[in-house]
Amino acid sequence: MQVLTTSRKPGRKTRRFAKVLARFFNWKYVNRGKLSLEDLAGIAERFWIISEVKGNPAILNLYERGEKTLEVSFTLSNVNKIKMDDSPAVFKGKAPIDPLVFGAIPQTKAGLKLTRKVEFRKKVVVKGDEWLFFYDDEMLFKLRILKISRSSR
């Protein structure tokens, strides 16, 4: 299970975005408080941290075994809060990163065949640098991806 948390003392927008994103990908949202990176690594082997720039959520970092492995910089539209089930998410379109990193259906031959045959409720539509997040054809939010950087280990 992946865990999502925020930087310390997040703003209202960041908390709301974190909770909706965690629910979308079936992650566990953890209130960070005074937890250090070591404490978070003790909770889960893989965890995500959302950081703010000027009070808005702007950076999504993936940590594996305490090491930062991925950083996604983005801008965010308004977040629509909806009750969601535990169904898996699927990416539509060519994603710059493997959707499996997020715990979504992978874009392998078998994964693409499955997405054509089964209608999924949670979809991430990738159009260039924009990722549109939908649940039952209702848009939750839109991310405009500014930069994706991988850390070499």
Curated annotation (Swiss-Prot):
UniProt xrefs under SUPFAM superfamilies: Class II aaRS ABD-related
Keywords: Ribosome biogenesis
The UniProt record lists the keyword Nucleotide-binding: no
GO BP terms, alphabetized: rRNA processing
GO molecular function terms noted in the UniProt entry: rRNA binding
Residues annotated as signal peptide: none
Keyword Chaperone among UniProt keywords: no
Record field: transmembrane: none
Domain of life: Archaea
UniProt-listed Gene3D superfamilies: Probable brix-domain ribosomal biogenesis protein
SMART domains recorded: Brix
Role: Probably involved in the biogenesis of the ribosome.
HAMAP family assigned to the protein according to its UniProt record, in alphabetical order: BriX
Protein name: Probable Brix domain-containing ribosomal biogenesis protein
Species name: Archaeoglobus fulgidus (strain ATCC 49558 / DSM 4304 / JCM 9628 / NBRC 100126 / VC-16)
